[in-house]
């Protein structure tokens, strides 16, 4: 049996086409969704991510604004900019590209963004709403992962989901989203003993640890859905995930590739959240 490849880029394109239609309808009502992205410093990876977000906005018809600051910006000045954007009716979503310089406290910056414009889903209020199953902006990568699993037509309810990784951005929230879908969730991390015994029980295995090709066929239950969140660059310059793709292909039922797996879904869910925020605000642009 060879696993079915879940092509995240194709799923993302399908969802972006739906978002484009929604944006057209909103614009007919005078509502233009707007996203502001704040970039601090000259980190090439951050700039590349921001470019992808701008391109996504342009594709679906969202107004986007890039606000750039030098690495020397003070925390106070950055907080003042967020306050300005919180009060700007043209902006439905505010995103601060992480990481930030060491002299700026990320927690203070994230908490300053209005929960109504927190399209990244990182604000403690958004996290609390997600934990309690309330309607909120879901974190983009975890939300994208759940959508990819749903593409397999597998009924998530009652399934055993194992998450390798416990970061605040992916590991912890993705487990909670599957719990909200009535799955049974197990977390594995660097201190977990007998990890393979646990992962072999997984109907759905999520891997987000940042270790190239860590997960091999002996981690996988036959027929499982395997979602590889890792993006690692090998010495050859080639990208690979946390899962040894070729090794696992004959055991898994479904698997995401790297690249063109989870990555395209992250920006797509950000666009989704921005459109949702515009719908909720319902502000007609003058």
Swiss-Prot record:
Keyword Oxidoreductase in annotation: yes
GO terms for cellular component: cytosol
Keywords: Amino-acid biosynthesis, Histidine biosynthesis, Hydrolase, Methionine biosynthesis, Multifunctional enzyme, NADP, One-carbon metabolism, Oxidoreductase, Purine biosynthesis
Chemical reaction(s) catalysed: (6R)-5,10-methylene-5,6,7,8-tetrahydrofolate + NADP(+) = (6R)-5,10-methenyltetrahydrofolate + NADPH; (6R)-5,10-methenyltetrahydrofolate + H2O = (6R)-10-formyltetrahydrofolate + H(+)
Amino acids binding NADP(+): 165-167, 190, 231
Lineage: superkingdom: Bacteria
MF term (GO), any: methenyltetrahydrofolate cyclohydrolase activity
Enzyme Commission number(s): 1.5.1.5, 3.5.4.9
Biological process, per Gene Ontology: L-histidine biosynthetic process; methionine biosynthetic process; purine nucleotide biosynthetic process; tetrahydrofolate interconversion
Pathway assignment: One-carbon metabolism; tetrahydrofolate interconversion
InterPro entries referenced in this protein's UniProt entry, alphabetically: Aminoacid_DH-like_N_sf (IPR046346), NAD(P)-bd_dom_sf (IPR036291), THF_DH/CycHdrlase (IPR000672), THF_DH/CycHdrlase_cat_dom (IPR020630), THF_DH/CycHdrlase_CS (IPR020867), THF_DH/CycHdrlase_NAD-bd_dom (IPR020631)
Primary role: Catalyzes the oxidation of 5,10-methylenetetrahydrofolate to 5,10-methenyltetrahydrofolate and then the hydrolysis of 5,10-methenyltetrahydrofolate to 10-formyltetrahydrofolate.
Family statement: Belongs to the tetrahydrofolate dehydrogenase/cyclohydrolase family.
Quaternary structure, from the entry: Homodimer.
Protein name in UniProt: Bifunctional protein FolD
Record organism: Bacillus cereus (strain AH187)
């Amino acid at each position: 049996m060879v696993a079915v490849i879940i092509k995240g880029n194709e799923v993302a394109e399908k969802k972006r086409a739906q978002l484009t239609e929604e944006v057209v309808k909103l614009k007919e009502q005078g509502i233009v969704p707007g996203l502001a992205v704040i970039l601090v410093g000259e980190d090439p990876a951050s700039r590349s991510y921001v470019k992808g977000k701008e391109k996504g906005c342009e594709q679906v018809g969202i107004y986007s604004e890039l606000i750039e600051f030098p690495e020397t910006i003070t925390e106070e000045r950055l907080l003042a900019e967020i306050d300005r954007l919180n009060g700007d009716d043209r902006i439905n979503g505010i995103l601060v590209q992480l990481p930030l310089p060491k002299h700026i406290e990320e927690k203070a910056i994230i908490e300053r963004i209005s929960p109504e414009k927190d399209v990244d889903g990182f604000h403690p209020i958004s996290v609390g709403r997600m934990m309690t199953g309330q309607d909120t902006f879901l974190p983009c990568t975890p939300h994208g992962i759940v959508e990819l699993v749903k593409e397999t037509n597998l009924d998530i309810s009652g399934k055993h989901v194992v998450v390798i990784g416990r970061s605040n951005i992916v590991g912890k929230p993705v487990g909670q989203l599957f719990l909200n879908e009535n799955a049974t969730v197990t977390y594995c991390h660097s201190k977990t003993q007998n990890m393979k015994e646990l992962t072999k029980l997984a109907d759905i295995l999520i891997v987000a640890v940042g270790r190239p090709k860590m997960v091999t066929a002996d981690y996988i239950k036959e027929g499982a859905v395997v979602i590889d969140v890792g993006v690692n660059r090998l010495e050859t310059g080639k990208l690979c995930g946390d899962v040894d793709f070729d090794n696992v292909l004959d055991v898994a039922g479904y698997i995401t590739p790297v690249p063109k797996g989870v990555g395209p879904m992250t920006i797509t869910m950000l666009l989704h959240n921005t459109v949702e925020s515009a719908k909720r605000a319902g502000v007609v642009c003058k």
